[in-house]
Amino acid sequence: MAKVIGIDLGTTNSCVAVMEGGEPIVIANPEGNRTTPSVVAFSKTGERMTGQVAKRQAITNPERTIISIKRDMGTDHKVDIDGKKFSPQEISSMILQKLKSDAEAYLGETVTQAVITVPAYFSDAQRQATKDSGKIAGLEVLRIINEPTAAALAYGLDKEHDQKIMVYDLGGGTFDVSILEIGDGVFEVLATNGNNKLGGDDFDQRIIDFLVDTFKKESGIDLKNDKMAMQRLKEAAEKAKVELSGVTSSNINLPFITADASGPKHLDVTLTRAKFDEITADLVENTMVPTRQAMQDAGLTPDKIDKILLVGGSTRIPAVQEAVKKYLGKDPFKGINPDECVAVGAAIQAGVLTGDVTGLLLLDVTPLSLGLETLGGVFTKLIERNTTIPTKKSQVFSTAADGQTSVEIHVLQGEREMAQYNKSLGRFQLTGIPSAPRGVPQIEVTFDIDANGIVHVSAKDLGTGNEQKITITASTNLSDSDIDKAVKEAEKFAAEDKQRKEEIDVRNNADSLIYQSEKSLKDLGDKVSADDKSKIESGVNKVKDALKGTDIEVIKKATEELQQSFYDISSKIYQQTQGAQSDPGAAGFGGQQEAPGAGQDENVVDADYKVVDDDK
């Protein structure tokens, strides 16, 4: 059976894993790293870069480098590169393609299916957008799974006794907290909460703001409008944040950060952990609000939690760990890798779907209440938040006016009492209702949430049996034709990448042959005739001229001709050497002399022998 990979599609970093021999294995990328930066960039010549290579060039190419695109999933945001507009789904698909390619290189086979994780607090539109990204990347997304739940799978796969655990997941761009009960292979989510606009990026931004303000006070120069300087500050801020998890102060030194009439300016600031904690204190507290709400929704007190799992790189921040410890009264469990455990959990879920992992049942929940707008702009909930999915719920409504022959079903997601303050998922019409006084027609609305957390809604006139069904697609989601177009674009990019690689291989091969030919001529010296030497030199010059151009076929042809000339001359020299070896009197290059005693076999006597055992 073909392998199904598990992917943690993160805001700042992504990770891919697979089940092998019953164990989840994290797949390293070609650079040798087990996580890949979620960065996409386009060079000025239009070449696409993804991952570490894209991140490395961000300082010199900030306007054409896309970071943290996950924060824009499910929105109508567009990235403009040379007049071409890319949706968040398309940019995310490029990251997924990179992970898919790395997995294929590791496995030695084509990968077409995946389980992809999303923040637990992702809306329906964001989940649908993630699924679309997978499709564009050439992946059938078998399941969308919540990140905290995936982390719990990674932790609890081999745990048999019952435990109540909290997964506190602070990633690069999102925050989630889930309360689960696990035991005997059953993983039941009791409650989940979160904030899709809170993550490590925000901690970085506080450091950037601090550096900008400090530099402005010292030099009078505002760096905010200098994109290259801001990119350098971003990298330095991220590095300082990481350092402050292990030391109490970090020196941020950026020479030549900018210049004015008096000359170049340098930034040199020392950031202490105490100052970092001070400027980010509200961010840490903002993670505790959903944490307390999730505990309340689960009906648990802190003493009932057996284990706290910290997930996401930002949970290494000491102030974050201290806040969690203070609230729950116990140290977090540190036996899982916060950067890899989500991908590992996704791989385990993939194993469940393929049958590689058995005896495991996952019961997840919907993070937000679902319902529709009713008379007066009220939000009427059909499915409450933290309901176990998949689930289905129906409720009967009626018309609001006499003679009404159609109704608009406005589907929403959220917790506010009034419809306008909740997230609109979509609208559809149920028509053909017989004219009747208001309140008489019976319209049954059914909400169905699948295991991916994606919503399907139907409305049925019980009087006529007339029914209308839709899978919710927000206005920000891509249509089927948009997805098909994006798939073709992705295939085109893949073909261009392949062609570019082939071009590099052809050029490298030509360079190698030039070096080999020139070295051989030098080493062989007089053994090569003047005509043959001239032929090789002519071929070398022809390849060098071809390399100056852009026509790959010309380079290939010149390389093949030089290769043939090289083979012909090598063969000729080999034959000459063999001829010298076969000359009986030759004792020169490759010649042989007769060994002493050779041919004197007349008086040879075969000696008898026996083995003597000294122990006897």
From Swiss-Prot:
HAMAP family with a match to the protein in the record: DnaK (MF_00332)
Phylogenetic lineage: Bacteria, Bacillati, Bacillota, Clostridia, Eubacteriales
Similarity section: Belongs to the heat shock protein 70 family.
Source species of the chain: Ruminiclostridium cellulolyticum (strain ATCC 35319 / DSM 5812 / JCM 6584 / H10)
Function as written in the Swiss-Prot or TrEMBL entry: Acts as a chaperone.
Signal peptide start-end: none
Keywords attached to this entry: ATP-binding, Chaperone, Nucleotide-binding, Phosphoprotein, Stress response
Protein name in the entry: Chaperone protein DnaK
UniProt-annotated stretches for the region Disordered: 575-616
GO molecular function, one term: ATP-dependent protein folding chaperone
Pfam families: HSP70 (PF00012)
